[in-house]
């Protein structure tokens, strides 16, 4: 590609999916520019690496670019997209650019409705501990690397494969992971769950004859498609027919302790520095891949025991002062689908048994809130206290029957928790100050702007201290 394309421009360069690819391309020696609506830590990092970042979208920003990269979040009437069309500069979907990177190395693509970011991070960490020095592109900040992407010298690139817009079908990896299949982003698939499952089957058809599909056999929808996968399959999970299986699972001190059974191998005792059964499954995917690539068991154990997590995935902010004295534990999580939320709540209950659980939740997208309305009511009813904000629209038009007020009314009718409704995220800190008590576990949760709340709480605490 480099003999033709020298300068690559990213529209929305500060986004989690775009910034990682941009960083790898900078490190490969490409001239990279980009634009976004606001400056953040990610754009500042890219600028420090040599990328040119413009704040605001303007046709002039793409000057000199040989290609313009866009995600599905970028509107077709964006001035930079219109300028690229007018100048006949190729407009490249994000997934297609990721596919180009995968052509340079052997790709390991992590797919599934939930758990992609954590699983991708675990795979990258285990391979790095095994000396394979992988390139990785992750949808969240890997704490140990201080970034969501890195150009390694090894043969492998580990990346998330996004099913939300079916763009994962652009990828041709040599190893694939399918963590689970659940009803989300159903607009892409015409609200037809069979079409969604078929897309995952087609994803496995991108594998070469020597490739493998590493699948979580605990998930009933994944189990249904396994007979339809024509390439070699490695099953992981808790089920009896898993080829990489966890047993003797125990939660202790915020960590998961378990033993891994693999065909033809000695039992492997593992301590995972993450809470929750869902994270044990994510770790099993990494163990399955590492075993296949002959990573030493000691390296696997070390990487999982020392795993420092990913930004906004059960990210611990420490102890915050409660208004009545004492302190509460603050955690932030990206969960925005009822299944993910239930897993995080269960992990918190396991990590902090007997403690009161307070959740501040910002729903993400009106369509998701509409499609999963009853499931949201059910999962939100399992916490001890709740702050609920208006829906983060993510560009969608409001739906009056699926907004924050409608969800609040349904929760009150269910009668298990009394939600404190706030119209904006800016009101969350004050609401939590009134609600949180000493000894509580407080989780801020959602895929929208609520991600800025825990940092503000921590900063305010630091300034007062």
From Swiss-Prot:
Catalytic activities: UDP-N-acetyl-alpha-D-muramate + L-alanine + ATP = UDP-N-acetyl-alpha-D-muramoyl-L-alanine + ADP + phosphate + H(+)
Record Pfam families: Mur_ligase, Mur_ligase_C, Mur_ligase_M
Alphabetical list of InterPro entries matching this protein: Mur-like_cat_sf, Mur_ligase_C, Mur_ligase_C_dom_sf, Mur_ligase_cen, Mur_ligase_N, MurCDEF_pg_biosynth, UDP-N-AcMur_Ala_ligase_MurC
Chief location: cytoplasm
GO biological process, one term: cell division
Binding site for ATP: 112-118
E.C. numbers: 6.3.2.8
Keyword Cell cycle: yes
Record's keyword annotation contains Ligase: yes
Listed pathway(s): Cell wall biogenesis; peptidoglycan biosynthesis
Keywords recorded for this protein, A-Z: ATP-binding, Cell cycle, Cell division, Cell shape, Cell wall biogenesis/degradation, Cytoplasm, Ligase, Nucleotide-binding, Peptidoglycan synthesis
Subcellular location: Cytoplasm
GO annotation, cellular component aspect: cytoplasm
Molecular function as annotated in GO: ATP binding; UDP-N-acetylmuramate-L-alanine ligase activity
Protein role: Cell wall formation.
Family recorded in the similarity comment: Belongs to the MurCDEF family.
NCBIfam families, per database record: murC
Protein name in UniProt: UDP-N-acetylmuramate--L-alanine ligase
Gene name linked to the record: murC
């Amino acid at each position: 590609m480099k003999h033709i394309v020298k300068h690559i421009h990213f529209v929305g360069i500060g986004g989690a999916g775009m910034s990682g690819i941009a960083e790898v391309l900078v490190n490969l020696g490409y001239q990279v520019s980009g634009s976004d609506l606001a400056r953040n830590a990610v754009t500042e990092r890219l600028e420090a690496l040599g990328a040119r970042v413009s704040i605001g979208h303007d046709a002039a920003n793409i000057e000199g670019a040989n290609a313009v990269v866009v995600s599905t979040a970028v509107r077709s009437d964006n001035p930079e997209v219109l300028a690229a069309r007018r100048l006949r500069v190729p407009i490249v979907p994000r997934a297609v650019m990721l596919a180009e990177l995968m052509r340079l190395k052997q790709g390991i693509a992590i797919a599934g409705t939930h758990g992609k970011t954590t699983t991708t991070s675990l795979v990258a960490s285990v391979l790095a501990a095994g000396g394979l020095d992988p390139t990785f592109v992750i949808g969240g900040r890997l704490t140990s690397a201080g970034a969501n992407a890195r150009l390694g010298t090894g043969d492998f690139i580990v990346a998330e494969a996004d099913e939300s817009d079916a763009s994962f079908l652009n990828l041709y990896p040599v190893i694939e992971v399918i963590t689970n299949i659940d009803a989300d982003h159903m607009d892409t698939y015409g609200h037809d769950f069979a079409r969604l499952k078929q897309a995952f089957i087609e994803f496995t058809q991108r594998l070469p004859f020597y490739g493998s599909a590493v699948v979580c056999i605990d998930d009933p929808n994944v189990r249904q498609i396994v007979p339809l996968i024509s390439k070699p399959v490695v099953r992981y999970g808790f089920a009896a027919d898993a080829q990489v299986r966890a047993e003797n699972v125990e939660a202790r001190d915020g960590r998961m302790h378990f033993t891994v059974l693999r065909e033809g191998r000695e039992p492997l005792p593992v301590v995972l520095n993450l809470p929750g059964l869902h994270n044990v499954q994510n770790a099993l995917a990494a163990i399955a891949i590492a075993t296949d690539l002959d990573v030493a068991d000691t390296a696997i154990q070390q990487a999982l025991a020392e795993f420092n997590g990913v930004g906004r995935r059960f990210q611990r902010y420490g102890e915050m002062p409660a208004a009545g004295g004492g302190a509460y534990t603050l955690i932030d999580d990206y969960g925005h689908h009822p299944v993910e939320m239930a897993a995080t709540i269960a992990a918190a209950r396991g990590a902090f048994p007997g403690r009161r659980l307070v959740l501040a939740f910002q729903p993400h997208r009106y369509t998701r809130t509409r499609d999963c309305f009853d499931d949201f009511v059910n999962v939100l009813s399992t916490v001890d206290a709740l702050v609920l904000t208006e829906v983060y629209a993510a560009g969608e038009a409001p739906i009056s029957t699926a907004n924050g007020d409608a969800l609040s009314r349904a929760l009150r009718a269910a009668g298990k928790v009394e939600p404190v409704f706030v119209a904006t995220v800016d009101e969350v800190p004050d609401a939590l100050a009134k609600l949180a008590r000493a000894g509580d576990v407080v989780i801020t949760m959602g895929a929208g702007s609520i991600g800025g709340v825990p940092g503000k709480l921590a900063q305010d605490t630091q300034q007062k201290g």
